[in-house]
Amino acid sequence: MSSEVKSRWSGSGSQKSGTARKPTMLEMAENAASRHYEPVPLPLQRSNSPDSSTDKNPESRAADSRAEVIINPDIPPKAIALPLSRYRGRNPFFSKVNIQGRTYNFLERPTGWKCFIYHFTVFLIVLVCLIFSVMSTIEQYHYFANRALVWMEIVLVVFFGTEYIVRLWSAGCRSKYVGFWGRLRFARKPISIIDLIVVVASVIVLCVGSNGQVFATSAIRGIRFLQILRMLHVDRQGGTWRLLGSVVFIHRQELITTLYIGFLGLIFSSYFVYLAEKDAVDDSGSQQFGSYADALWWGVVTVTTIGYGDKVPQTWIGRTIASCFSVFAISFFALPAGILGSGFALKVQQKQRQKHFNRQIPAAASLIQTSWRCHAAENHESATWKMYVRQPTKFYVASPSPKTKKSVGKRKKLKTDKDNGLNSEKSLNVPNITYDHVVDKDDRKFENSNIDGYDSSVKKSLGILDVNSGALSRANSYADDLDFIEGEPVLAPITHVSQLRESHRVTVKVIRRMQYFVAKKKFQQARKPYDVRDVIEQYSQGHLNLMVRIKELQRRLDQSLGKPTMFLSVSEKSQDRGKNTIGARLNRVEEKFVHMDQKLNTITDMLHHLVAHQQGHPHPQTQPQAQGTVVQAVASTHSSLPSYEQLTVRRKDQDNQPDL
């Protein structure tokens, strides 16, 4: 190969010796021997003689048809670290929309330790500024606090102003805040209005201040108190106020009731104390309850358990009234605190339950997925097994052209399937199945390039490459290359569902069944209650539901079967006859059977009398008695029974005897 390359270089040099021009980069790239492409002859052109491939000169090999070329896996392909845009040649991580969205999430939706550090630092700065504002009102620290506060105010105004502009710009990542009107909608939010007021107030304070002092006049001191609104800057999303509002809304009825009754107690206690103490004079000679307003002030201070002690009842009547109403009113004024405390506790418990429930969602989804995969593994559809099939990675090179300049522009293109390719393997987390194949040592080079339709070759002309065939190997993956280097048998990947053997399918079924049991165990662990009180509540709720179901079942049984007759009185039995229950029907059937038994006994007695009358000759005096008994028995029977005349059979001798 080196001699051929040298001759080619010498030939090109002899043609251009007159100009003494150096070979261009294109010519060097064309004539250089490639270590990544090695030609493989077609099956029809293979010969058993070892010298058949060496006898051909470069011209004859150039005239041959195309040969398949296998990529040498000496240099494994490397994945790009940063994903590039599909339509641009740059990273979308640094695009405008991405930066805008990340900034908006960082400022408006803080999550993570970085956001926590930033917002906590802002809170500390605002708190320090508020402390210096308080110190500026003290005469001892007035000078020092004012000088430090001037520079702190300048820094904070610049910081909050810049942050407000950045917030306004980053809000454009959301559809409802796009454009001028969208930004105006964002600026009309309550927290944005507070930020704007804080920035404007700080600018006014700094501009109007004189001699380097922030608080020059009383008007500026009034504006300075607007800086307290900076403390609201910490809670951007208003989660604190939403939580408080939700608790108050849930317990609104209880709060309104307690406040209403407490207010009534305050009014009545203040009025009665005023009536008892309006003429009383203390030791200094002044009236402490000279008006109803003084009595109301005393009532508010008393029922709220503050007790300043500036107004005290002087008479025993007033003290008695005050003590009685205080016990009643204080109890109602203390109830809202307990109601709100219990509401916050229930809210925290509800959030914990929600977190516990959210942990069950992935476990339930995994259980459903694994159970469905176990069910799908039992059928023989090809879609069930496609996820275990690896599509071949194909490399293509453009067809050769007579022009040398165009041949340099040929590049290989990586083509992967989106569903079963290399990129989707990480998301599916499904291993690729390989199988063994036996080839001869002499034919390994050719068989490895055409295993069950596995096409990883690049078709290119031998005349252009013009290199000797060397050791060939598959360009499947880096792990396969290592296995091939170590001398282990090469496993070709499964590229079609038909190549899956029964052992593969059984293995997949076993793995899926194991995954199902693991997912089931995780779901059962996620379903376990996290507190003993929840266990008690769960058991009590289950017991209550069981009792309700038992009562419902008993009601339905009583409605369908009826109550047992042994527990019913005669009057209840008579009332139960008209009902269409199974018990009432059984009672009526029993009565019918008793009646039928009586009728059958009567019929049997009548038949016995008839048989005895036909066989014997009873005494004439007893015959009318017997006939009367039969007639009486017949009369006592139901009207539907046959009469005595129908049952009586006349004898033949009586028929033949003439009438006297």
From Swiss-Prot:
Database matches in InterPro entries: Ion_trans_dom, K_chnl_volt-dep_KCNQ, K_chnl_volt-dep_KCNQ_C, K_chnl_volt-dep_KCQN1, Volt_channel_dom_sf
Basic residues bias locations: 403-415
Compositionally biased tracts (Polar residues): 1-18
Main location, first listed in the record: membrane
Coiled coil stretches, renumbered: 579-615
Residues passing through the membrane, by range: 114-135, 147-169, 186-211, 220-235, 254-276, 316-341
Organ and tissue specificity: Expressed only in rectal gland and heart. Faintly expressed in intestine. Undetectable in kidney, brain, testis, liver and gills.
Location(s), subcellular: Cell membrane; Cytoplasmic vesicle membrane; Membrane raft; Endoplasmic reticulum
Function of the molecule: Pore-forming subunit of the voltage-gated potassium (Kv) channel involved in the regulation of cardiomyocyte excitability and important in normal development and functions of myocardium, inner ear, stomach and colon. Associates with KCNE beta subunits that modulates current kinetics. Induces a voltage-dependent by rapidly activating and slowly deactivating potassium-selective outward current. Also promotes a delayed voltage activated potassium current showing outward rectification characteristic.
Family: Belongs to the potassium channel family. KQT (TC 1.A.1.15) subfamily. Kv7.1/KCNQ1 sub-subfamily.
Name this protein carries in UniProt: Potassium voltage-gated channel subfamily KQT member 1
Annotated source species: Squalus acanthias
